[in-house]
Amino acid sequence: MAAKKLKILFVTSEIVPFVKTGGLADVSSALPQMLSELGHEVRIVIPKYGAVDDRKFKIHEIVRLKDLVVKIGDKDVMFSLKSCFLPGPRVRVQIYFLDNQEYFGSRNGLYVDPKTGKDYPDNDERFILLSRSVMELIIKLGWIPDVIHLNDWQCGLIPAYIKTLYKDQESFDKFKTLFTIHNLAYQGEFPASTFKKTELPKELESVSKGIMHNGKVNFMKSGLMFADVINTVSQTYANEIRTKEEFGEGLKDVLAKRKDSLYGIVNGIDKNVWNPEKDKQIPKTFSAKNIEDKLVNKKELAERFGLAYDEKIPIIGLISRLFDSKGFDLIQKAFNDLMKL
């Protein structure tokens, strides 16, 4: 029996080739394309930051998604949702861009102000708007997804909205939410005064049953509490964050309560991009059939970084930020064994 073809709404705060700060942007591009190739109907929602080029990507207005209004605390905030297709060689995946000049269009930084190096002070309002815009998108389009796939704290309020503020909305009981933890260390923590801005019901302004944590509103906790299913990047990590304080980032107990709904799924790669046999970004393509050609790339890498080249001495290049979460401690532990290979 063939697997059911799903309608999937994928919500993210960054995506290649439009904007990127980390691996989330790569996943947000590759996964929807692969799901679409498998026959699912996938649509994406993302903020339209100032760095996104309308003309280059042919982003256009949608009349019925123009000049919508939601409340953020005492403010009426107007926004529109524009659209284009995710550039890809095989499938066309539709993207909806949340367009608001004040919160997104006037800023090139995604979360951090490039001028100060600090988080934007209104990040709470910015991503409240993202959450509310997703609700309004579904209502206005009448396109009811089977699954809403949410990524990291920036999307964490959406499950809470679905189960409270929008619970009586027609057809909102028909879809399920999947919340993916990409980086548990970043939780979207804001002052208690942020709660009023969310418009969520008073009962969620608690620690035991709501979105408060250590005296602050915690967007990540909201996603963990109210999503139907949670996943993270490996089964080992999924076990660690719910059983060990050093991995749980203060949310171990919350995750432990959701253990039956918490899964580990290892990220894959797009073999059409990460394929040395046809990669245009490396000096010399190679494959298992002509592995010796890899030495050309090794020599080029050594020269680029001013290293003495020796065919017999290994060079390891990593595309990564230098954070503990990237597993550099594992390389350190295995280093002596690696050198014996």
Annotate each predicted stretch with a short phrase.
Residues M1-L341:
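Catalytic cores of nucleotide-sugar-dependent glycosyltransferases that transfer UDP/GDP/TDP-activated
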